[in-house]
Amino acid sequence: MDKRIAIVTGANRGIGTEVVRQLAEKKWKVILTARDEAQGRKACEDLAGRGLDVQFHRLDVTDPENIHRLAQDLKADPGRLDVLVNNAGVLMDEDRGSDRITIETLRRTMEANFFGPFQLSQALLPLLNRSDDARIVNVSSGLGQLSDGGGGYPAYSISKAALNMMTVQLAEDLKGRVKVNSVCPGWVRTEMGGPGATRSVEKGAESIVWLATDPMIPNGKFIRDRKEIAW
């Protein structure tokens, strides 16, 4: 039986690296991508050194040409994808409200957190269509919830709300071919989350890996701790 194949973006550290590790330990072949080539290769080498089937590809999700090259490379080898985990993202908000956030900050945040995942999902869809159980997992945030929204981090929150709507749209348009879900990993102790966060990276990765691997996952939902939450 062929190994299942996943690609995880923004996987040079934190939740991304942990998702790669957990998938690879389930005997998956995992493609680890990162914008920072040195950090990405080191993360890949560390995991491969444990006997895990992990390969590195450099990817800047804000660069359409880079996305196109990656899609062409993956078309040649391995020629198929089962799961895309859109994990790469940025938190660039200054300590100010939406009335004072700069358009440049909003634009750059949207490029990384929304346009990048959208373009990558479109580019890799032909490879996902070759799978008999394809999935896209979009790593979102509770800050993107319209039902529970509050002030703070406006650029990040807006970008994650857009990512959630992308999930809804793709889930409907790809129904029967690719299952698409958003997931909130919670407040995780990463470079983005900070040392005061309440969750380990292992816990943060848990629902992402569940959406990638469990045979009974839903479609078009927002998930936290393996349970559906409101948009």
Where on the chain are the PLM-derived regions?
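A glycine-rich helix->loop->beta "capping" turn
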Residues: 50-53, 73-86, 92-94, 179
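C-terminal helical subdomain
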Residues: 175-176, 182-188, 194-231
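Rossmann-fold scaffold of SDR-type NAD(P)-dependent oxidoreductases
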Residues: 9, 81-89, 113, 138, ...
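The beta1-alpha1 cofactor-binding region of Rossmann-like NAD(H)/NADP(H)-dependent oxidoreductases
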Residues: 37-38, 58-72
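Canonical Rossmann dinucleotide-binding motif of NAD(H)/NADP(H)-dependent dehydrogenases/reductases
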Residues: 1-31
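Catalytic loop of short-chain dehydrogenase/reductase
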Residues: 90-110, 115-118, 122, 129-176
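Conserved glycine-rich Rossmann-like NAD(P)H-binding loop of the short-chain dehydrogenase/reductase
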Residues: 26-42
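Short-chain dehydrogenase/reductase
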Residues: 71, 121, 167, 205-208
